[in-house]
Amino acid sequence: MRMKEDAMKNGQLKPGYNVQVGNENTFAIGYDIFADAADMRTLPVHIDNVQKRLEHTFEMVIADAGYGSEENYEYLERNGSVALVKYGSYHQQRKKSFKKKIFNSENWDYDSEQKAYTCPAGNRVPYVKTVTKETKNGYTHTIDLYQCHSCEGCSLREKCTKAKEGRTVQRNEKWLAQKKQVNERLDKEENKKIMKRRSVECETVFGQIKGNQHFRRFHVRGTEKVRVEIGLLLMGYNIKNLMRKEQEKKAA
């Protein structure tokens, strides 16, 4: 997999493991090792494993934008967990500059009854067909396709599309509804405070292990051996964390 540390700056592939750690109040409460570099695909498995070990279902799951996807939002809803998880374009889409991008179909007028968009040139972009796409995890996306039939001779075509057949638009109703729900949820003041706390708590675990303890690579090979090594590291982290909190209580 590709590492964050890339001295040659050429995106070279290196053998490695994707470590997922769940934490609560700065303590590590569960971890998993994956050969998959994509954090997004690890969330359901990681949550299931930690819940099974703890015999507890999480009422709320908080994660960064690397975990936000249609599949994960649906999984968390099915799990009975409130998702405080941003999606990849969350911050970008909330900027004023994003609303000014007239060629982005998310800024176009949409007629739900007629099932058609209106493009920047004022032309209709009607519904054509529905297709499905399957992820590596076997999850199926349902996507509606729209296509403009008035691109020929349009003065805005060069800025709008380079496709020979004209501008096409993909619309995923479930994904749009999920993003709207996420936006509304994250706009609540109490949830803003929780998200700020998340950035501190989650980064503390890896910050301590990688930054302060200078642990940058595993000393063993094989998933099971790596699982033991990271488990010992996290156990040590939790013990030190508990001792620090006890000392702070005594000092207070």
Each model region followed by its residue ranges:
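Anion-binding and metal-coordination hotspots
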Residues: 1-252
